[in-house]
């Protein structure tokens, strides 16, 4: 259970951190801390073979805010794989060189000797600029890699960004919007509240709906990539950089070429020494293969290009004192410690908290109350405690491990390095988080039933179980602060609408340990009805792809737990009608679809899942291998490209007719 439990924890916490970092521009932890957790998840997934559907390893990036107009990029904006040590850089360099050598041994048309391009990695906000006819026509954020948010007005306040360039072809140019450290210092002399760091200042300015705010922060931008170019003739990174310079894009005056790890390592050290002398926040180095044909042969993972890697510098360490430890309860009942620190200034940020993973983390690092500890961070909020300064420090006290839940006072139990509250039915934090999961879009999809709303319902209406959601009356809601006629009716309508639910969504909503969306779908397809699933046998379950012994045991135990079974029966008595799945044949095998524009009857994810379940591949970019492009309103350049290539086009209605006739 311990490894599976750890995977689930890592997926949940990394998704939370990614949401705050990419979507809210309100990072909760340092990049280095995120990378450590991410690498741990990758290793555990490889070791166990368990990859949850919502794992960040499946993702390219973060979610898109609804406050800005959306825009589809002409090509996917990939993030970069990260190396945490020089040894990892060496391995990447060696693998790349070996790949080219093996390729050349087996092909007549040889690839050139591998040359690496080494450059600064700046810490700001990625901007993607679209030029057509020589003019800037669109500027967007990276968004989730496929769809960004339009920030054209904000970007135009940056004087270093050209509004007109020489080349008249359609193109996308990628760069980094940054706030120079001198601009940050000058801004803080005359403004309150003061900005905490340059990265958040740049991101916040570019994501502000008022361009006047952006202009006031005196941003800059550096460019490093041509993401798309019509009739692209560029063959190397070196040619690309020259093309950017010739078209008035600002380049950072540092570029080095290397043919070996030793040379790459030398340039990494050089940039590390220069980083505190420059006027821009930098947190590492980017290393790319120079030749584009070699890049094409190396290709991509679903998240990163194999031809580039980012090396992040080890953050500086500081010391502070652990004053207290608080214990918080999650959806699964896990009780997690958080260290409250004596405030310490790190990189213009006042740090007061640090997450401690578990009891083992406390014991292994010998952390005690009043201990002087090493903490480290890059440019984000919550640091990592590395260990104590002096294990023999005398004026410290042992951190008391709680025996009773800090919320419901139930007796806790220990499982491995974690402690849990067993009171899953009425422990408020657990109940709230389970209800949030139950109401989430890919579960029962109760629009408007947020965590904040649920906390109010539990407190004011004395709701004690999930099924009581369906007993809430409009009159009760209208008595609560913030609930008027329309909001109350909308929530009641959403609750009522959720009673008609697909079997896969209902299975996912129950929150069975280790069961994500993909496994819920597979269970629905296998058992066809909820009654059949409740009677599932261990021997049957382990025959299903992606379900091993541990997950099979979890499912059997879940449905044989008397309390859970009674709760499910009570839930079903509220009028829940479960739609059983039809037999799905893979009728779209070997067909590739691309979606573009705003859809009416589906979210992009819903339609992607629908097509994927029928065997289709849904791609993020149009090519000659695309079979169909499905387009909605405000379809962008992908539609134009599809027309140019002669790809078959479908409206949403035409797609529905097409699927109905399969």
From Swiss-Prot:
<dbReference type="GO" id="GO:0003911">
    <property type="term" value="F:DNA ligase (NAD+) activity"/>
</dbReference>
<comment type="function">
    <text>DNA ligase that catalyzes the formation of phosphodiester linkages between 5'-phosphoryl and 3'-hydroxyl groups in double-stranded DNA using NAD as a coenzyme and as the energy source for the reaction. It is essential for DNA replication and repair of damaged DNA.</text>
</comment>
<keyword id="KW-0234">DNA repair</keyword>
<feature type="binding site">
    <location>
        <begin position="31"/>
        <end position="35"/>
    </location>
    <ligand>
        <name>NAD(+)</name>
    </ligand>
</feature>
<keyword id="KW-0235">DNA replication</keyword>
<keyword id="KW-0227">DNA damage</keyword>
<feature type="active site" description="N6-AMP-lysine intermediate">
    <location>
        <position position="121"/>
    </location>
</feature>
<dbReference type="GO" id="GO:0003677">
    <property type="term" value="F:DNA binding"/>
</dbReference>
<dbReference type="InterPro" id="IPR003583">
    <property type="entry name" value="Hlx-hairpin-Hlx_DNA-bd_motif"/>
</dbReference>
<dbReference type="InterPro" id="IPR041663">
    <property type="entry name" value="DisA/LigA_HHH"/>
</dbReference>
<dbReference type="InterPro" id="IPR001679">
    <property type="entry name" value="DNA_ligase"/>
</dbReference>
<dbReference type="Pfam" id="PF12826">
    <property type="entry name" value="HHH_2"/>
</dbReference>
<dbReference type="Pfam" id="PF01653">
    <property type="entry name" value="DNA_ligase_aden"/>
</dbReference>
<dbReference type="InterPro" id="IPR033136">
    <property type="entry name" value="DNA_ligase_CS"/>
</dbReference>
<keyword id="KW-0460">Magnesium</keyword>
<feature type="binding site">
    <location>
        <position position="408"/>
    </location>
    <ligand>
        <name>Zn(2+)</name>
    </ligand>
</feature>
<dbReference type="InterPro" id="IPR013840">
    <property type="entry name" value="DNAligase_N"/>
</dbReference>
<dbReference type="InterPro" id="IPR004150">
    <property type="entry name" value="NAD_DNA_ligase_OB"/>
</dbReference>
<dbReference type="InterPro" id="IPR010994">
    <property type="entry name" value="RuvA_2-like"/>
</dbReference>
<keyword id="KW-0520">NAD</keyword>
<feature type="binding site">
    <location>
        <position position="405"/>
    </location>
    <ligand>
        <name>Zn(2+)</name>
    </ligand>
</feature>
<keyword id="KW-0464">Manganese</keyword>
<feature type="binding site">
    <location>
        <position position="427"/>
    </location>
    <ligand>
        <name>Zn(2+)</name>
    </ligand>
</feature>
<feature type="binding site">
    <location>
        <position position="176"/>
    </location>
    <ligand>
        <name>NAD(+)</name>
    </ligand>
</feature>
<dbReference type="InterPro" id="IPR036420">
    <property type="entry name" value="BRCT_dom_sf"/>
</dbReference>
<feature type="binding site">
    <location>
        <begin position="79"/>
        <end position="80"/>
    </location>
    <ligand>
        <name>NAD(+)</name>
    </ligand>
</feature>
<keyword id="KW-0862">Zinc</keyword>
<dbReference type="Pfam" id="PF03120">
    <property type="entry name" value="DNA_ligase_OB"/>
</dbReference>
<dbReference type="Pfam" id="PF14520">
    <property type="entry name" value="HHH_5"/>
</dbReference>
<dbReference type="GO" id="GO:0005829">
    <property type="term" value="C:cytosol"/>
</dbReference>
<keyword id="KW-0436">Ligase</keyword>
<feature type="binding site">
    <location>
        <position position="119"/>
    </location>
    <ligand>
        <name>NAD(+)</name>
    </ligand>
</feature>
<keyword id="KW-0479">Metal-binding</keyword>
<feature type="binding site">
    <location>
        <position position="421"/>
    </location>
    <ligand>
        <name>Zn(2+)</name>
    </ligand>
</feature>
<dbReference type="InterPro" id="IPR001357">
    <property type="entry name" value="BRCT_dom"/>
</dbReference>
<dbReference type="GO" id="GO:0046872">
    <property type="term" value="F:metal ion binding"/>
</dbReference>
<feature type="binding site">
    <location>
        <position position="288"/>
    </location>
    <ligand>
        <name>NAD(+)</name>
    </ligand>
</feature>
<dbReference type="InterPro" id="IPR012340">
    <property type="entry name" value="NA-bd_OB-fold"/>
</dbReference>
<dbReference type="GO" id="GO:0006281">
    <property type="term" value="P:DNA repair"/>
</dbReference>
<dbReference type="Pfam" id="PF00533">
    <property type="entry name" value="BRCT"/>
</dbReference>
<dbReference type="GO" id="GO:0006260">
    <property type="term" value="P:DNA replication"/>
</dbReference>
<protein>
    <recommendedName>
        <fullName>DNA ligase</fullName>
        <ecNumber>6.5.1.2</ecNumber>
    </recommendedName>
</protein>
């Amino acid at each position: 259970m311990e490894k599976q439990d750890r995977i689930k924890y890592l997926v949940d916490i990394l998704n939370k951190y990614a949401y705050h970092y990419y979507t809210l521009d309100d990072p909760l932890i340092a990049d280095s801390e995120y990378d450590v957790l991410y690498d741990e998840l990758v290793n555990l997934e490889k070791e166990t073979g368990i990859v949850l559907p919502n794992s960040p390893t499946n993702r390219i990036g973060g979610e898109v805010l609804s406050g800005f107009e959306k825009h589809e990029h002409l090509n996917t904006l990939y993030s970069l794989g990260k190396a945490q040590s020089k040894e990892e850089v060496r391995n990447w360099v060696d693998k790349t060189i070996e790949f080219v050598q093996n390729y050349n041994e087996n092909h007549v048309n040889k690839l050139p000797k591998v040359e690496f391009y080494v450059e600064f990695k700046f810490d700001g906000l990625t901007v993607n600029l679209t030029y057509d006819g020589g003019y800037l026509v669109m500027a967007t954020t990276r968004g989730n890699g496929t769809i960004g948010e339009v920030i054209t007005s904000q970007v135009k306040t940056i004087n270093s960004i050209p509004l007109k360039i020489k080349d008249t072809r359609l193109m996308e140019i990628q760069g980094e919007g940054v706030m120079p450290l001198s601009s940050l210092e000058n801004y803080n002399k005359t403004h309150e509240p003061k900005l905490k760091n340059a990265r958040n200042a740049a991101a916040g300015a570019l994501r502000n709906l008022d361009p006047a705010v952006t202009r006031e922060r005196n941003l800059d931008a550096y460019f490093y990539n041509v993401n798309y170019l019509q009739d692209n003739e560029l063959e190397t990174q070196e040619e690309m950089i020259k093309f950017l310079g010739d078209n008035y894009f600002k380049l950072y005056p540092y570029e080095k070429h290397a043919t070996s790890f030793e040379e790459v390592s030398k340039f990494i050290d050089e940039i590390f020494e220069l980083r505190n002398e420059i006027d821009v926040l930098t947190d590492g180095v980017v290393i790319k293969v120079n030749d584009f044909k070699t890049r094409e042969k190396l290709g991509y993972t679903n998240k990163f290009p194999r031809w580039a890697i980012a090396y992040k510098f080890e953050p500086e360490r500081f010391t502070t004192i652990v004053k207290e430890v608080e214990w918080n309860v999650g959806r699964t009942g896990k009780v997690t410690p958080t260290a409250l620190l004596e405030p310490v200034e790190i990189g213009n940020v006042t740090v007061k908290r640090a997450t401690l993973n578990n009891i083992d983390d406390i014991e292994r690092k010998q952390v005690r109350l009043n201990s002087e500890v090493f903490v480290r961070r890059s440019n984000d909020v919550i640091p990592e405690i590395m260990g104590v300064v002096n294990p023999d420090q005398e004026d410290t006290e042992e951190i008391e491990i709680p025996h009773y839940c800090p919320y419901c006072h139930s007796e806790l139990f220990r499982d491995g390095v974690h402690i849990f509250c067993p009171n899953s039915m009425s422990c408020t934090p657990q109940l709230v988080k389970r209800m949030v999961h139950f109401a989430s879009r890919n579960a029962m999809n109760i629009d408007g039933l947020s965590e904040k709303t649920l906390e109010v319902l539990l407190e004011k209406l004395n709701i004690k179980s999930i099924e009581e959601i369906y007993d809430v009356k409009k009159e009760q809601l209208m008595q609560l602060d913030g609930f008027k006629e329309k909001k109350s009716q909308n929530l009641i309508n959403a609750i009522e609408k959720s009673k008609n639910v697909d079997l896969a969504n209902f299975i996912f909503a129950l929150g069975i340990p280790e069961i994500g969306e993909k496994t819920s779908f597979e269970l629905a397809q296998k058992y066809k009805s909820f009654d059949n699933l409740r009677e599932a046998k261990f021997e049957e379950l382990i025959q299903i792809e992606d379900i091993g012994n541990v997950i099979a045991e979890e499912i059997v135990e879940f449905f044989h737990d008397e309390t859970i079974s009674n709760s499910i029966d009570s839930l079903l008595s509220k009028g829940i009608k479960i739609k059983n799945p039809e037999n799905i044949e893979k009728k779209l095998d070997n067909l590739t679809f691309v979606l573009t524009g705003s859809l009416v009857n589906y979210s992009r994810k819903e339609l992607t899942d629908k097509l994927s379940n029928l065997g289709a591949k849904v791609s993020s970019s149009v090519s000659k291998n695309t079979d169909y492009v499905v387009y909605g309103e405000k379809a962008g350049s992908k539609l134009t490209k599809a027309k140019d290539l002669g790809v078959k086009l479908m409206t949403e209605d035409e797609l529905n007719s097409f699927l109905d006739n399969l």
